[in-house]
Amino acid sequence: MRTLLIRYILWRNDGDPSYYNDDFEKLMLLDELVDDSDVCTLIKNMRMTLSDGPLLDRLNQPVNNVEDVKRMIAISAKVARDIGERPEIRWEESFTILFRMIETYFDDLMIDLYGEK
């Protein structure tokens, strides 16, 4: 699951078609959980610098169930899409934060999205 999410969010950032995976279809459905007009506000609330990827912990939004997890993934993907591709982005920090917030719900997420662990 970690590898899939990393590949998906990086793909959303650069849009390289050779990086596309059919498993991304289910993850793209999560986009409807976050309104495009909210992304600028979310980026502002994350107080990001030019070298930051999505910093979800700065939103102070709890993750208490699989729906919260799906929203965090959607926020990460949309922020990654909108910040643009730059070589200096510190993706490791962003992914560490994301996974720390959602790892408790990985199995539930897999079952919800794909019907199995």
UniProtKB/Swiss-Prot annotation:
Domain of life of the source? Viruses
**UniProt keyword annotations, A-Z:** Early protein, Host-virus interaction, Inhibition of host NF-kappa-B by virus, Modulation of host cell apoptosis by virus, Viral immunoevasion
Entry keyword Ligase: no
Which Pfam families does the record match to this protein? Poxv_Bcl-2-like (PF06227)
Q: Secreted: present as a keyword of the record? A: no
Which GO annotations describe the biological process of this protein? symbiont-mediated perturbation of host apoptosis; symbiont-mediated perturbation of host defense response; symbiont-mediated suppression of host NF-kappaB cascade
> What turns on expression?
Expressed in the early phase of the viral replicative cycle.
The UniProt family comment states: Belongs to the poxviridae OPG035 family.
Function, in words: Bcl-2-like protein which contributes to virulence by preventing host NF-kappa-B activation in response to pro-inflammatory stimuli such as TNF-alpha or IL1B.
Protein name from the UniProt record: Protein OPG035
Tell me the organism: Variola virus (isolate Human/India/Ind3/1967) (VARV)
Give the encoding gene's name.
Answer: OPG035
